[in-house]
């Protein structure tokens, strides 16, 4: 299954114009909101912590084996134009084809929920968080926190933003999007007593990640057309629903 590295902003010194929190605070809320949607769609993830920096986040990601690096930020206008700009920008590294593809998917989906869709754009950049990760990377600036309307939109749409970004990650990896249910334990049960396949896609032709013995307990995160998204040990994948007893 795909694995992504989430890097919500560590910039606690960037206050929202509303006075309700910082860039670090709200981008971590967005990352929190993404988690159940990612799990329900078979996407594993790791993330930084607020005491880290962009540089240490990149180093940590590069020590792992990730398929995508997603940095979550909100923007601010330059001196003399504070509060005057609005919009969402998905940045990618100029020579990264998959970074550009990810940015285009994110921007297209974000246009569906941002109140000014014509101001949702993609741009290339050489910023460290798209240049230095080994995995394809996107840095998304979700609105301007020095603009009253943007700041209030972010604050009141945390779950919608998290869902939208998770939907983009599912699309990037070619996975069907599934809405999460409450996570719950399940038991693998087969009539023969043999193991079942944990697959990378919800299909009998999906790549087999591992085999789960009958009687083993798994955690169920979601369901898609007769398949459950389950976590077995450290491996997230799909199991045919008839073999999972909840």
What are these model-derived regions, one by one?
Residues 215, 228-232:
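SH3/SH3-like beta-barrel fold
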Residues 4-16, 59, 64, 69-78, ...:
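Active-site-adjacent mobile loop/cap segments within catalytic or ligand-binding domains
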Residues 178-197, 210-214, 222-224, 245-246:
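SH3-family beta-barrel domains
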Residues 11-13, 51-54, 74-80, 95-98, ...:
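Solvent-exposed loop/turn segments at secondary-structure junctions
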Residues 181, 232-246:
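Boundary regions of SH3-family modules and the immediately adjacent low-complexity/disordered segments
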Residues 25, 29-39, 97-113, 151-180:
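Long, well-ordered alpha-helical scaffolding segments within enzyme catalytic domains
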Residues 2-97:
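Catalytic-core regions of hydrolytic enzymes
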Residues 50, 202-207:
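Short alpha-helix capping/helix-loop boundary micro-motifs
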């Amino acid at each position: 299954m795909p694995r992504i590295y989430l890097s919500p902003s560590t910039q606690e010194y960037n206050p929202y114009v509303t006075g309700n929190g910082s860039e670090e605070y709200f981008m971590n809320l967005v990352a929190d909101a993404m988690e159940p949607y990612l799990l329900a769609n078979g996407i594993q993830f790791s993330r930084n912590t607020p005491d880290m920096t962009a540089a240490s986040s990149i180093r940590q990601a590069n020590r792992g084996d990730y398929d995508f690096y997603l940095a979550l930020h909100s923007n601010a206008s330059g001196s003399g134009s504070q509060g005057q700009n609005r919009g969402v920008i998905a940045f990618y590294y100029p020579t990264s084809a998959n970074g550009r593809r990810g940015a285009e998917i994110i921007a297209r989906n974000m246009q569906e929920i941002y109140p000014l869709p014509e101001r949702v754009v993609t741009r290339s950049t050489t910023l460290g968080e798209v240049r230095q990760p080994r995995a394809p990377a996107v840095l998304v600036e979700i609105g301007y926190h020095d603009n009253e309307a943007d700041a209030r939109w972010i604050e009141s749409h945390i779950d919608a933003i998290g869902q939208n970004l998770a939907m983009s990650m599912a699309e990037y990896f070619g996975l069907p999007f599934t809405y999460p249910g409450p996570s719950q334990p399940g038991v693998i049960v087969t009539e023969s007593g043999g193991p079942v396949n944990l697959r990378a896609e919800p299909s009998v032709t999906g790549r087999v990640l591992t085999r789960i013995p009958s009687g083993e307990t798994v955690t169920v995160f979601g369901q898609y057309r007769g398949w459950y998204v389950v976590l077995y040990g450290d491996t997230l994948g799909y199991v045919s629903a008839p073999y999972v007893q909840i």
